Amino acid sequence: MKKYFAAAALLMMMAACGSAGQDKKLEGTTWKLAKMEAIPAAAVGKEADFFTLEFNAADTMVAGRTNCNRFFGKYELKGKELELKNLGMTRMACPDMQYEDAFVKMLDEVDRFEIKGSELTFFDADKSLAVFKAVEK
């Protein structure tokens, strides 16, 4: 009986360890900006839903929020290549609009992505543009 209990406990621990290090999926995950050169960390972390984005596989739509406005558009995936298309957004005027402008410019420059664990990085060729963290729900 003790052998079975020990074996069951070992299997459960192995299963837990195996799932802990898995990469998040681009689609179906809420991503929050963690680091971008043009936006100070204080502006990024100001509100929980500032500088977030989500990719919806069902309709290949991307949607999110800057520090002021909401945005939406289409995306196309080819392996690790990513193209964001037809982005539109609400047009409220807010303080610190330069951060929103920099964020939207970055979205236009993205041509590929990489996910390691719960971290998403956008690239333009080999240049890292922004790093996002998966939001735990």
Predicted regions: what they are:
Residues K2-A6, C17-K137:
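Lipid interaction determinants
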Residues L10-L11:
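Short, linear, compositionally biased motifs with a strong N-terminal bias
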